[in-house]
Amino acid sequence: MKASMFLALAGLVLLFVVCYASESEEKEFPRELISKIFAVDDFKGEVRECKGFGKSCVPGKNECCSGYACNSRDKWCKVLLGK
């Protein structure tokens, strides 16, 4: 009986701690998001966007994102295998 009461109390305390932590993160989230948006705008002209899976590409131009390669036959980014 004492062990089950202790486990129930410990579970409630753990639930309280998790809820409190997630609530404090939610309050910080808008500020972090805004700061990241403005930081990205500063380097917008310098950063080259890569193309993901299935996007059309030109072989040899290295347009695909990391882990993908432009397939010369189909001319779209595929998963890079074996290298």
From Swiss-Prot:
Matches recorded under Pfam families: Toxin_12
**Effect on the protein of changing residue 51 to L:** No gain of activity against hNav1.7/SCN9A
Q: Which UniProt keywords apply?
A: Amidation, Disulfide bond, Ion channel impairing toxin, Knottin, Neurotoxin, Secreted, Signal, Toxin, Voltage-gated sodium channel impairing toxin
**TM region positions:** none
Disulfide bond entries = 50-65, 57-70, 64-77
Spell out the subcellular localization from the entry.
Answer: Secreted
Keyword Disulfide bond in record: yes
Q: Which domain of life is it from?
A: Eukaryota
Which GO molecular function terms does the record list?
A: ion channel inhibitor activity; sodium channel regulator activity; toxin activity
Question: Record's Gene Ontology CC terms?
Answer: extracellular region
The family note in this entry says: Belongs to the neurotoxin 10 (Hwtx-1) family. 14 (Hntx-1) subfamily.
A further note on this protein reads: Negative results: has no effect on mammalian SCN3A/SCN1B (Nav1.3/beta-1), SCN4A (Nav1.4), SCN5A/SCN1B (Nav1.5/beta-1), and SCN9A/SCN1B (Nav1.7/beta-1). Has also no effect on sodium subtypes in rat DRG neurons containing Nav1.1/SCN1A, Nav1.6/SCN8A, Nav1.7/SCN9A, Nav1.8/SCN10A and Nav1.9/SCN11A. Klint et al., 2015 worked with a recombinant peptide N-terminally extended by an Ala residue (AECKGFGKSCVPGKNECCSGYACNSRDKWCKVLL).
Q: What does this protein do?
A: Weakly blocks the rat SCN2A/SCN1B (Nav1.2/beta-1) sodium channel (IC(50)=68 uM) and the insect sodium channel para/tipE (IC(50)=4.3 uM), without altering the activation or inactivation kinetics (depressant toxin).
What is the recorded name of this protein?
Mu-theraphotoxin-Hhn2b 3
